[in-house]
Amino acid sequence: LGDVPGTSGAVFVARPESKSPDRFGLFGAPPLEEGYVILVGDENLKQFPPPSKFLPSVWNRSRAARLVCCSIVLCCLCLAVFLYWSENMGQTVTTPLSLTLDHWKDVERTAHNQSVDVKKRRWVTFCSVEWPTFNVGWPQDGTFNRDIITQVKIKVFSPGPHGHPDQVPYIVTWEALAFDPPPWVKPFVHPKPPLPPSAPSLLPEPPLSTSPRSSLYPALTPSLGAKPKPQVLPDSGGPLIDLLTEDPPPYRDPGPPPSDRDRDDGEAAPAGEAPDPSPMASRLRGRRELPVADSTTSQAFPLRSGGNGQLQYWPFSSSDLYNWKNNNPSFSEDPGKLTALIESVLLTHQPTWDDCQQLLGTLLTGEEKQRVLLEARKAVRGEDGRPTQLPNEINDAFPLERPDWDYNTQRGRNHLVLYRQLLLAGLQNAGRSPTNLAKVKGITQGPNESPSAFLERLKEAYRRYTPYDPEDPGQETNVSMSFIWQSAPDIGRKLERLEDLKSKTLGDLVREAEKIFNKRETPEEREERIKRETEEKEERRRAEDEQKEKERDRRRHREMSKLLATVVSGQKQDRQGGERRRPQLDKDQCAYCKEKGHWAKDCPKKPRGPRGPRPQTSLLALDD
């Protein structure tokens, strides 16, 4: 080692073998110090720790050691991942919200059956963010508890600024999933309690329906605990309860809870029982048995009197409100049609003040509702029968705040009737647009439109764009003239030629127009007539062409005959008098006497008339 730099003067010191049998190298290898020598200098000779203390040296020297270490690390990593996965999978819970998202196609199909459309993002937002803030027990993961769903629906259908019309399709769909659950929802719906034997069935079991009916009543699903006794409402002098925030009033004595199906179908009490008195009076419904109706029928029936003459309240169903809104144009687009709908609802259903606000809030926008209420308050009349400006009379007849009217008294019902009349007047006045006669003139009869339908459109245009009432006898002449001038061309021409047109009423004109309209040819007859007229026109044109051709040939023949006759006669004359042709005359030769020096007109030999001969005119020569 003398050639190695830095090792000059070094000596080799042998280390003794270790006699301890329990000292081994890594993975059973013999100790590294056996037969190993340390190079030390002679200047600082001292003891160093053996190399076996430095295990990384084995990692660099042994491939098997590296393979074993990598296998151990990989096994530990796989074990940790397996334990973490097992722990998390064991904690995964299926919630109603995740269940509906997994079966979203079925949810959309259910919404389509309810005549609504739902979006997945808004579905998640309403379920996890909006509805838990209603404080009715709705969890963020959703629920199929019918009681909680009904409470949420009451909040959604609240009138005024507290309602949420944009959430109606979603809560209606969720309610349909709970009340008519598909197979994947049934395990999560609480089973209905069996009907006790002591409770007789009030109505026969209706057939199963694919479209569940909705109601604004809270679900009365009996709880597992003791059911508290229903509270009987005070006498009719007490204040009205809020149907959208309070429980519905009881109508019969507490008894065994009926089934959900019986409650949804609106069953009547047994014959021997009478409903408890209640101050809630509005639309009347009989408590007697009703025929089983299809599930798609309306739940808001006209008012009826009960067995004891007591008025009973039933609110509008959500399906009625939503169908009215979707199946009719907006108030701004067609105020007449929506006004007619609300008028029929006011007459047949006799809604309360709260119901009127709910109806207006559903069918009208905020601006339209304010305009209707303003026009209705303008229509309030005083004692003299003219519109009044007194605030107390206006607020008494058409209040903006909820009035304290007792619907079981005649005075309360009179207030309600007057309120409906004023509301209808407000709808009619608010639906009128500024006067625009051009709009009325632009209403014309369609090609296949009947005169009656055209007259209805014309009258609607008069109501909407003019301040005139088309039903007023004083406006009948204007409406009649518009009907004649704006009818279909064939009908208008025949109406204008009617005898004694001035004495005809609008009804007479409509009947005459109906006769003309009904005598119109069918499309097949019109096509056949056009075909026949085309053939006749073609035949006439062909005959005219033939006649013109014949006339042209005749004229050509006549001209040719004249030409030939002229040529033949000229040739004949040339042959007969060819030799007797007169000789050529000179320039100064007379054609009469053949002498030169003058012309025939100045010939002295030519006999003259009684005027005597003309003086001879001399021809001057150049030399003269």
From Swiss-Prot:
Q: Where does this protein reside within or beyond the cell?
A: Host cell membrane
The segments annotated as topological domain Cytoplasmic are: 1-63
List the PROSITE patterns hit by this protein, alphabetically: ZF_CCHC (PS50158)
Gene Ontology CC terms, in alphabetical order: host cell plasma membrane; membrane
Q: Which domain of life is it from?
A: Viruses
Q: Which Pfam families match?
A: Gag_MA, Gag_p12, Gag_p30, zf-CCHC
Q: Where is this region: Disordered?
A: 200-284, 290-309, 520-624
Indicate where this protein is primarily found.
Answer: host cell
Q: Which GO terms describe its molecular function?
A: nucleic acid binding; zinc ion binding
**What are the annotated glycosylation sites?**
113, 478
| Keyword match Secreted | no
Compositionally biased, Pro residues: which spans?
A: 200-209, 247-258
Post-translationally, this protein is described as follows, namely: Glycosylated by host. Cleaved by host near the middle of the molecule, releasing the c-terminal half containing capsid and nucleoprotein domains op GAG.
The family database entries (SMART domains) matched by this protein are listed as: ZnF_C2HC
Report TM segments: 64-86
UniProt lists compositionally biased (Basic and acidic residues) regions at: 520-552, 572-605
Its membrane topology: Single-pass membrane protein
Q: Which residues lie on this side of the membrane: Extracellular?
A: 87-624
Gene3D superfamilies for the chain: Gamma-retroviral matrix domain, Human Immunodeficiency Virus Type 1 Capsid Protein, Zinc finger, CCHC-type
- Which key words are in the record? Glycoprotein, Host cell membrane, Host membrane, Membrane, Transmembrane, Transmembrane helix
GO biological process terms held by the UniProt record: virion assembly
PANTHER family, A to Z? GAG_P30 DOMAIN-CONTAINING PROTEIN
Biological role? Plays a role in viral particle release. Presumably acts by facilitating the fission of the virion bud at the cell surface. May prevent the antiviral activity of murine APOBEC3.
Q: What is this protein called?
A: Glyco-Gag protein
Lineage at the top is: Viruses, Riboviria, Pararnavirae, Artverviricota, Revtraviricetes
